[in-house]
Each structure stands twice: as C-alpha cells, then as structure tokens.
A protein has these predicted regions:
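Residue-level signal for functionally critical sites in structured catalytic/ligand-binding pockets
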Residues: 37-42, 47, 129, 133-134, ...
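Alpha-helix termination/capping residues and helix-transition junctions
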Residues: 53, 124, 169-171
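A short core secondary-structure module
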Residues: 162-182
C-alpha cells in the first residue's frame, strides 16, 4: 500500500464549502469538554483522536505522502477553529503543523525516517514536536549551542542532555531533539 492510499476519508471527500461547517462542529465538540482538561490538566487524547478521525493531524503532511498538503496559511483556519473550542489542543496542533511543514524539506533527517514520521501521522495520528529549550541556554532563538550532545556509537546515536519542556510532550510519538554532535 502506498502512503497516498492512507489519506483519511475527510481529506478526500469534503469540499471547501462544507469544510467550514465541519470546523465549526469540531470547535463546538472540543469546547464542550474543554473544562475537563482545564480542571484535570490531562493530555487531551480524545481531542486528538477526533482530529485524527477528521484527517487533521496530517493536514500539513504532503499529499504525495497521504496528508492534506496544506500550507501553514491554510492550516490557520483549522487552528482558529480548534482554538475557539480548546486552546491547549490548538497549541499542540500548531506544533504538529510546524514540524510537518518543515520535515520533508529537511535534509538533516534520513529519508526513511522522514517518511515514517509522515506515515505515522497519517495512519495513526502520531504527534511530533521539537525539544529545544534547555536550563542554561533557554530558548535557542536567542542564539547559542545546546548543551545536549549527540555521539555516534556502533549502535547508532547516543543523546545526552536535559530539556526543560516540549509542548504536548505527554502525547507525542516523535521528539525532534536539538543537540550538537561531537
């Protein structure tokens, strides 16, 4: 089976006029349970299951790989609708979209791994985000090299270091760890 045959039904069957209606319904459903996650602090797994059922976790995965092939500008409408219902879910979804929008153009990832991450998002709703912020460095947006070290071993790579957080970490399948190699 090719990756393109894994595309969720929603991305194949909903026309643009109906998409706004679908997003409004999703917003309402997410809003109905937002208080549960606000009060408990739990990861909103059911929200991501719902988004996956609608093909929205793979929205920025290229069409050739089974995703929606959407640009970040197009994904903005989905983010707005999700944020209207449940902002924490929207923040994690933003990270998913950002990672997938850059992943397939990255030559620092082996092709087989890039394809696997995309396939996992399409098929299983797998989430990805970056681990970049460190105790001493803070956010890398200010410059500097990470203290996290990646060393090649006979078995692959060994990564050691400490990250402070990653948005959505409790529900991520994939972690893109920012490190320097030695």
């Amino acid at each position: 089976m090719s990756l393109s045959s894994l595309r969720p039904p929603l991305l194949q069957s909903v026309d643009v006029a109906d998409f706004d209606t679908v997003l409004e319904r999703l917003s309402q459903r997410l809003g109905a349970t937002a208080h549960v996650y606000d009060e408990s602090g739990e990861f909103p797994r059911e929200n991501f299951k719902l988004l996956h059922e609608h093909g929205l976790l793979a929205l920025t995965v290229p069409k050739a790989l089974g995703g929606g092939g959407a640009s970040l500008a197009q994904a903005r409408n989905v983010i707005a609708a999700v944020a209207k219902g449940e902002p924490s879910t929207a923040l994690i979804l933003v990270m998913q979209y950002l990672q997938h929008s850059r992943l397939q153009d990255s030559r620092s990832w082996p092709e087989a791994l890039r394809l696997r991450v995309a396939q996992d998002a399409v098929r299983d709703g797998a989430l990805i985000n970056a681990l970049r912020v460190e105790p001493d460095l803070g956010t890398p947006a200010r410059g500097g090299l990470p203290a996290t070290i990646a060393r090649r071993t006979s078995e692959g790579w060994r990564i050691s270091g400490r990250k402070i957080y990653s948005t959505g970490s409790h529900g991520l399948t994939w972690f893109s760890v920012w490190a320097r190699s030695t």
